From Swiss-Prot:
InterPro entries: ATP-NAD_kinase_N (IPR017438), ATP-NAD_kinase_PpnK-typ_C (IPR017437), NAD/diacylglycerol_kinase_sf (IPR016064), NADK (IPR002504). Its cofactor is a divalent metal cation. The active site is at D73 (proton acceptor). This is NAD kinase. GO terms for molecular function: ATP binding; metal ion binding; NAD binding; NAD+ kinase activity. NAD(+) binds at D73, G74, N147, E148, H158, R175, D177, T188, A189, Y190, S191, L192, S193. The gene is nadK. The lineage of its organism: Bacteria, Pseudomonadati, Pseudomonadota, Gammaproteobacteria, Alteromonadales. GO terms for biological process: NAD metabolic process; NADP biosynthetic process.
Amino acid sequence: MSAFTKIGLLGKADDRGTQLTLETITTALIHRGFALCLEARTAEQLNLPEEVETLSLPDLGEWAEIAIVVGGDGNMLGAARALCEYDIGVIGVNRGNLGFLTDLDPDEVMTPLLSVLNGNYHVEERFLLSAEVINNGSSSGTGRAINEIVLHSDKVAHMIEFELYVNDHFVFSQRSDGLICATPTGSTAYSLSGGGPILHPGLDAMTLVTMFPHTLSSRPIVVDGNSEVRLKAAFDNDLLQISCDGHVRMTVHPGDDVIIKKYPKALRMIHPIDHNYYHVLRNKLGWGSRLF
């Protein structure tokens, strides 16, 4: 693999541990002669030399070959939704909790990071989902997600009614708390908590998981990744919401359609050469170790 020469660095430096990791990486890379730029809002929170270059996130995406994101999975998701628009690889340093998307240990970050920057890595394409709300035939909002798109009530613990179509084929109507449409990346997030299956990130598929359905026969459905999923809100619902990765929210009125499909651009995840997906699952989910 080709080495990286132009490196972007960003993170939400809201605690001292994250600040130290960002400052350590900055100092080490500048000392070794790498061309480094920090995301401007990140740099404002750090104690760095004045000569450190800074760029806005869109400009960083245009300039850099790889972006290093320091933080938890939430920080990684936010950065990835923006950076997927550019021809840039993304790697994470875990300063959060589980860290499914952030491979590098902050306490031992420089050795594996330098190995990656020198060309010892592999690339994994992760697809995103897009959501569009259609009101009376016109688009009223769009969003995209790395993990999942969720249809739910704007009230707490409130049942809704909707119909599900896949490629314009009617699947079911249902009364439940909502529906989760997740990518393979998101299959270990909210979807997993709702009883959904774990999908290997290399699969071209998405999973549809209903939330607390008012039926005993409801089960998760896995569909082709190129499918178009349409959710139609019942006319007697109150206002509903679409959430993209738990952040971007759009209002859904009674009778609206929500179109969910693969986003045209993918995220280029960069992993260390020894990355093992099943080791990550076993470690993060606390599965048992080998018996023999």
